Amino acid sequence: MIATALQLVASVCAEFSAQVETCSGNRAVFLLQLKLADGTTIPYHLEVTSDGDRLSVRELAPNNLPGFCPQRHINGDGTFCLYWAAEEGLVVTTDVVAREWWRTVWKYLKQQARVTKLRKWPDDAEWAHGEAARYQKQALEAASRLGGAFEEALQNSEVVVKTTRARRYAQRLIAQVFVYDQHLYSVWLDSDKVVNRKQRCFCGSSGNRKPARLKACHDHAEDAVKLAQSKLRWEEKENEFWAALKGRQCCGTTDICPLKDGP
């Protein structure tokens, strides 16, 4: 008989200082003793539910964490946002993956302990909220292809894309891309092309040699367009995410939260 996802995580839970309290059907409750570096132990009663081979987890009652907090990656139903499910969701079909799932839960809860002290999410490389994460991923991939400096700048929030109208060319809409406050290139948004494809590429791969023209440097002209487009969509979807939550009450456990501006 093939073990279910819940049975697999239950079979290895003791390795992660957890024990089964109840397990029936597609629901189980675990008591996890989270030990921190300072010796403090935080008991978590975790409710885990399965949907096929995928698992979701929440605190049984909001004792250690708020019941909802986008800034702390706690969904509206109280489940933990452990990863971006569309790309990174774990399919628990073996004990190896079950252990990886527990490691992910442990890392998440340790980060939550840090949030309690810092009053902000400690990891700068976190996923954006909701559908914005899809475009964040696309932007990161494009930045990576353009060179490590671009990827680092993007992760440090030093890539800014501004839309404006061209002074000439019938006021066409363009996206201007700034990296560390320096305007590097612009993109025609109606044709998805870099405005000046003859400019020197900014990827840095030429070393001491004169950089190649952007249009002739690998696929970097296309990557530059993808970065600009994805960054704009990322910001658009992030704004839509927060707009949809207008009226929800802020839990007050982080210093910066868009919900604080609400009623």
Regions found by a protein language model. Give the residues of each.
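Short secondary-structure junctions and interdomain/linker hinges
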Residues: 16-20, 108, 112-116, 161
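Domain-level detector for trafficking modules
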Residues: 74-144
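Charge-rich (especially acidic), low-complexity segments
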Residues: 123-263
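Compact alpha/beta protein-protein interaction domains typified by the UBC
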Residues: 10, 14-87, 95-96, 162-202
